[in-house]
Swiss-Prot record:
Function: Negatively regulates transcription of bacterial ribonucleotide reductase nrd genes and operons by binding to NrdR-boxes.
Organism: Hydrogenovibrio crunogenus (strain DSM 25203 / XCL-2) (Thiomicrospira crunogena)
Protein name: Transcriptional repressor NrdR
Domain ATP-cone, chain residue ranges per copy: 49-139
PANTHER family xref list: TRANSCRIPTIONAL REPRESSOR NRDR (PTHR30455:SF2)
Gene, per the UniProt record: nrdR
Recorded family membership: Belongs to the NrdR family.
Keyword terms of this UniProt record: ATP-binding, DNA-binding, Metal-binding, Nucleotide-binding, Repressor, Transcription, Transcription regulation, Zinc, Zinc-finger
UniProt xrefs under NCBIfam families: transcriptional regulator NrdR
Any one Gene Ontology molecular-function term assigned to this protein's record: DNA binding
Pfam family, one: ATP-cone
Length: 154
């Protein structure tokens, strides 16, 4: 790696350790020419699948879109922003680990609903009402009854 101070081509690694829960490698380096020290972070370059929308269009996966959907569902609910970030990161990692090139948006919606069911049941019902296009109160009632049954069986 070139030195960011003098642009010399030779640097040596002084120290390496894992960072951000093992997702990155932090390296302390020293320039062989000017003796300046600097830190670099190394991450794997992973490609996320393209999302197949319900109309057949394809778009790149967008963490922020998932985060916005979660924030909207969790609006005025007692859930920390760190919990939202954890859900986004978990879905991101899961999709990366699967290694598929394309994924239907409906599958991402189901992943979000499962995460919300564990995180906050009110937010789950909110999200489900939009995601599944509830038309009347009966649809809400049915979803809540399913949720109550699932909670009792646990």
């Amino acid at each position: 790696m070139h030195c960011p101070f003098c642009n010399a081509p030779d640097t040596k690694v002084i120290d390496s350790r894992l960072a951000t829960e093992g997702a990155q490698v932090r390296r302390r380096r020293e320039c062989m020419s000017c003796a300046e020290r600097f830190t670099t972070y190394e991450t794997a370059e992973l490609t996320l699948p393209r999302v197949i929308k319900s109309d057949g269009n394809r778009e790149r996966f967008d963490d922020d879109k998932i985060r916005r959907g979660l924030i909207k569902a969790l609006e005025k609910r007692p859930v920390a922003s760190e919990a939202i970030d954890q859900v986004v990161n978990r879905i991101h990692k899961q999709l990366t680990a699967e290694g598929v090139r394309e994924i239907p948006s409906s599958q991402i919606g189901e992943l979000l609903m499962e995460a919300l069911k564990e995180l906050d049941q009110v937010a789950y019902v909110r999200f489900a009402s939009v995601y599944r296009s509830f038309q009347d109160v009966n649809a809400f009632r049915e979803e809540i009854e399913k949720l109550v049954k699932a909670t009792k069986s646990q």
